[in-house]
């Protein structure tokens, strides 16, 4: 989620705002869920399309996002839920919304306010505590996680979640820095990774992949994504839409694979000589992947890697 909207002293641009909201095919009287409120750019646009009977539930695990919603969204059609979208099923059950949802929007990744606030520990460009938690009130911080993880597992995480070529070398240097108590801030980590990287990529900081990998591990981002995709299909009504914006290939691969798998007829026993059971597709792909316009990329460079995929419950 790299979002920015003109509010107060901050600028936050919601990525592919019109495209993602249009993808929901909004019914003015429908029920919608914004799984990643951030600073409310997408939520505001959805509310603008809803009538008096429409409803919008926004979810965010960041306490700062909840405070922002409480201060800036006074609308009887709107409700903010503090928590992870991994619990989407429970949130819908509590409201008797299972099978009644008209649309779900998921804007993945880190929001611009989280990146810009050094204290959150997401940025390798600003000195801050090694935190990286979407919800700083729960779970292990990045520093705690790096202290506990062994070198082999760390190398696997860097390779799998960061697609880092020099994962083993970087993991070794990180663990050495941890043991020597030289890893206290985000800039400490960035410097360790930079020194450990024998080659650098043009236009990309050497620590980019490592920070991504550690953040994904700390927040269990890919596991949570798989869960929310499965739950989305269960809670959407027939004709309900799912709009998902991803920001790196690992996320997009999961979303693409999920839509493809769930839109195919499945033979549960393909090797059986007798056709025993066939599972019909539960969603269909809507259009082709959508990418930010050239103008949007120029206005908000963080949107450049974004991909929007849309599916419909059948």
Curated annotation (Swiss-Prot):
Record has Cytoplasm as a keyword: yes
| InterPro entries according to UniProt | RsmH, SAM-dep_MeTrfase_MraW_recog, SAM-dependent_MTases_sf
Q: Would the keyword Ion transport be found if you checked this record's keyword annotation?
A: no
Please give the coiled-coil regions recorded for this protein: none
Q: Per its UniProt entry, what is the enzyme's top EC class, as one word? A: transferase
Task: Provide GO CC annotations from the record.
Answer: cytoplasm
- In terms of domain of life, where is this protein from? Bacteria
Which reaction does this chain catalyze? Answer: cytidine(1402) in 16S rRNA + S-adenosyl-L-methionine = N(4)-methylcytidine(1402) in 16S rRNA + S-adenosyl-L-homocysteine + H(+)
- What GO annotations for molecular function exist for this entry? rRNA (cytosine-N4-)-methyltransferase activity
What is its subcellular localisation? Cytoplasm
Q: What is its EC number?
A: 2.1.1.199
Q: Which GO terms describe its biological process?
A: rRNA base methylation
Annotated binding of S-adenosyl-L-methionine, by residue = 40-42, 60, 85, 107, 114
| Major place of residence | cytoplasm
- Which keywords describe this protein according to UniProt? Cytoplasm, Methyltransferase, rRNA processing, S-adenosyl-L-methionine, Transferase
Q: What does this protein do?
A: Specifically methylates the N4 position of cytidine in position 1402 (C1402) of 16S rRNA.
Q: Which family does it belong to?
A: Belongs to the methyltransferase superfamily. RsmH family.
**What is the name attached to this protein's record?**
Ribosomal RNA small subunit methyltransferase H
For this protein's source organism, the top of the classification is: Bacteria, Pseudomonadati, Pseudomonadota, Gammaproteobacteria, Thiotrichales
**What gene is this protein translated from?**
rsmH
């Amino acid at each position: 989620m790299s979002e920015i909207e003109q509010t107060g002293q901050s600028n936050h641009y919601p990525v592919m705002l019109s495209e993602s909201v249009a993808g929901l095919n909004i019914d003015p009287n429908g029920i919608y869920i914004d799984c990643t409120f951030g600073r409310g750019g997408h939520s505001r646009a959805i509310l603008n399309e809803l009538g008096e009977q429409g409803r919008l539930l926004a979810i965010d695990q960041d306490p700062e996002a909840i405070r922002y919603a409480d201060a800036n969204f006074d609308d009887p059609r709107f409700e903010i839920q503090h928590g992870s979208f991994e619990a989407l099923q429970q949130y819908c059950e509590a409201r008797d919304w299972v099978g009644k949802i008209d649309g779900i929007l998921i804007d993945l990744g880190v929001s611009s306010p989280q990146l810009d606030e050094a204290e959150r520990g997401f940025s390798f460009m600003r000195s801050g505590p090694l935190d990286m938690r979407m919800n700083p009130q729960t779970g292990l911080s990045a520093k705690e996680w790096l202290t506990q993880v062994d070198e082999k597992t760390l190398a696997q995480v860097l390779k799998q979640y960061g697609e880092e070529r020099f994962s083993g070398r970087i993991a070794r240097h990180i663990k050495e820095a941890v043991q020597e108590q030289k890893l206290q801030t985000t800039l400490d980590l960035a410097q360790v990774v930079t020194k450990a990287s024998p080659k650098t990529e043009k236009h990309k900081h050497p620590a980019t992949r490592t920070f991504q990998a550690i953040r994904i591990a700390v927040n269990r981002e890919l596991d949570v994504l798989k869960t929310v995709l499965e739950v989305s299909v269960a809670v959407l009504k027939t004709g309900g839409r799912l709009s998902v914006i991803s920001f790196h290939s690992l996320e997009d691969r999961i979303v693409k694979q999920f839509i493809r798998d769930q839109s195919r007829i499945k033979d549960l026993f393909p090797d059986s000589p007798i056709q025993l059971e066939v599972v019909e597709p539960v969603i269909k792909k809507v259009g082709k992947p959508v990418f930010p316009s050239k103008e949007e990329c120029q206005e908000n460079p963080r949107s450049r890697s974004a991909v929007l995929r849309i599916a419909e419950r059948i």
